[in-house]
Regions:
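Short aromatic/hydrophobic contact patches that present stacked aromatics
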Residues: 16, 66, 114
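Alpha-helix boundary/capping residues
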Residues: 40, 48, 139-143
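Acidic-residue sensor for enzyme active/binding pockets
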Residues: 32, 64, 96
Length: 145
């Protein structure tokens, strides 16, 4: 059980579940949730932040991730992934993603991951690019930094 709701997330991306996402128990396999979470964040960085993975000098590497599961999802269904930012540092970002069945006010899962942005050539931490910071600031939860 969770107290999270759709209202706690600033951007949503609908994702169609696939037959291949299902496991032997008849619901979306837990590992597929990570794919939904990654797709929601990366989709936001590309569509709202103008991130170009091929041309960017700074790239985000996932250094930590996790997910809590509350209820199953199935095929066929539309899955709404709500994205928020809970930490926006000099070179790192912590995202949280609520994974919702369409029209369900409570999430089926709550996942997170941390990106550390590194220079593509040196693989050393670098400042978060200004265009990405500007795109992520609206998703920062009140009281978080």
């Amino acid at each position: 059980m969770t107290t999270e709701t759709r209202d706690n997330f600033g951007h949503f991306l609908p994702i169609q579940s696939r037959w291949a996402d299902m496991d032997a128990y008849g619901h979306v396999n837990n590992a597929e949730f990570y794919s939904y979470i990654d797709t929601a964040v990366t989709g936001y960085l590309v569509s709202q932040g103008g991130h170009d993975k091929d041309a960017a000098t700074a790239i985000g590497l996932v250094v930590e991730s996790g997910c809590k599961y509350f209820k199953p999802l199935a095929f066929p269904s539309v899955i709404d992934c709500g994205v928020r930012v809970t930490k926006l540092g000099r070179s790192s970002v912590r995202y949280e993603v609520g994974v919702f069945a369409a029209y369900d006010p409570e999430p089926a899962a709550l996942g997170f991951f941390v990106h550390v942005f590194v220079d593509r050539d040196t693989m050393r931490p670098t400042d978060l690019p200004a265009h990405l910071r500007s795109a992520l600031e609206p998703l920062l939860r009140a009281g978080d930094a």
